Amino acid sequence: MGVAPVSNQPLVAQQPKGIIDPSTGKPIGSNDAFFGEINNELADKGFLVTSTDELINWARTGSLMWMTFGLACCAVEMMQLSMPRYDVERFGFAPRASPRQSDVMIVAGTLTNKMAPALRKVYDQMPEPRYVISMGSCANGGGYYHYSYSVVRGCDRIVPIDIYVPGCPPTAEALLYGVLLLQKKIRRTGTIER
């Protein structure tokens, strides 16, 4: 026994609910002539019309506060990144000592089983949205000490990792490239879902 349609009219998709049209990915009304005219008038006067998500992501990439979780020799390269030769603060990437004030945690070095709960505790103290950069072979997968009984084989078993920086130890340029990749990733992602 089937259910017969009530009328022979074609089904019409409902109007999208929200700001973004799911079929195009653009704001609702962006192809409207009225809004296009306003956008063109404001562009001539030096204004920029954008979505709030893009504005928040742009601001977030220019003000990333990082804290160190230096566990071994990779931390020396991480310190070198803050020195005048590379001056990572010009990219809006400034160090902070407290996890409650930082957005990014750089895990650099060998993570042991005894240190893993402390890493998770510090990660949980960071405000959302929070990002983690895993720096060096030891943090990425255990490195040279991979088969030791006391080493965690990658800090991604304890906290979610956003950027992996390979090397033993990775150079400051490699970490700087990882920071730039993180900023690019933040620009791509939405503000609510991560």
From Swiss-Prot:
Keywords, ordered alphabetically: 4Fe-4S, Cell inner membrane, Cell membrane, Iron, Iron-sulfur, Membrane, Metal-binding, NAD, Quinone, Translocase, Transport, Ubiquinone
Cofactor binding remark: Binds 1 [4Fe-4S] cluster.
Reaction(s) catalysed (UniProt annotation): a quinone + NADH + 5 H(+)(in) = a quinol + NAD(+) + 4 H(+)(out)
Signal peptide boundaries: none
EC number: 7.1.1.-
Iron found in the keyword field: yes
HAMAP family: NDH1_NuoB
Name of the protein: NADH-quinone oxidoreductase subunit B
